[in-house]
Amino acid sequence: MEIKPSRIFSTITIFFLCLLLAHVTSKASSSSLCNGSVAECSSMVETEEMSVIMESWSSQRLTEEQAHKLSYGALRRNQPACDGGKRGESYSTQCLPPPSNPYSRGCSKHYRCGRDS
């Protein structure tokens, strides 16, 4: 069974038009909640905007506070933060990441190194 591309396009177009219609009607119904004066409606909108700002601010503060806390696993005794290495080595030797671009290139003829001259 073969479906024509024009049929798929029309189906997708109808679907998005339905979504657009639902979005527009929901916006229209939410904006028609205020039946008072312009001042009353504007103060109601400002209050709603302020509550959204306050919610985002408080959630941002909570995430910032949680980012600075240590986990209980980090507080265990005799547990190095990294692999630790051999006995007698400092714990921090294994914490360094491997070099991102180690030098592994040879000497080309262009540079006329001592061995190629």
Curated annotation (Swiss-Prot):
InterPro entries per record: RALF
- The record's principal subcellular location, in a coarse class, is secreted
Post-translational modification as stated in the protein's UniProt record: Proteolytically cleaved, probably by S1P, a subtilisin-like serine protease (subtilase).
Compartments (UniProt record): Secreted
Where does the record say carbohydrate is attached? N35
Annotated S-S bridges: C82-C95, C107-C113
Q: Which UniProt keywords apply?
A: Disulfide bond, Glycoprotein, Hormone, Secreted, Signal
Indicate whether Signal appears among the record's keywords: yes
| Record-level GO cellular component terms | apoplast
Q: Propeptide ranges, please?
A: 27-64
Annotated spans, Disordered = 77-107
Record-marked site positions (Required for proteolytic cleavage): Q60, R61
Pfam families named in the record = RALF
Q: Which domain of life is it from?
A: Eukaryota
The Gene Ontology biological process terms listed for this entry are: calcium-mediated signaling; cell-cell signaling; regulation of growth
Q: Name one GO molecular function term.
A: hormone activity
Segment forming the signal sequence: 1-26
Protein task: Cell signaling peptide that may regulate plant stress, growth, and development. Mediates a rapid alkalinization of extracellular space by mediating a transient increase in the cytoplasmic Ca(2+) concentration leading to a calcium-dependent signaling events through a cell surface receptor and a concomitant activation of some intracellular mitogen-activated protein kinases.
**What family, per the record?**
Belongs to the plant rapid alkalinization factor (RALF) family.
Q: What is this protein called?
A: Protein RALF-like 32
Q: Which gene encodes it?
A: RALFL32
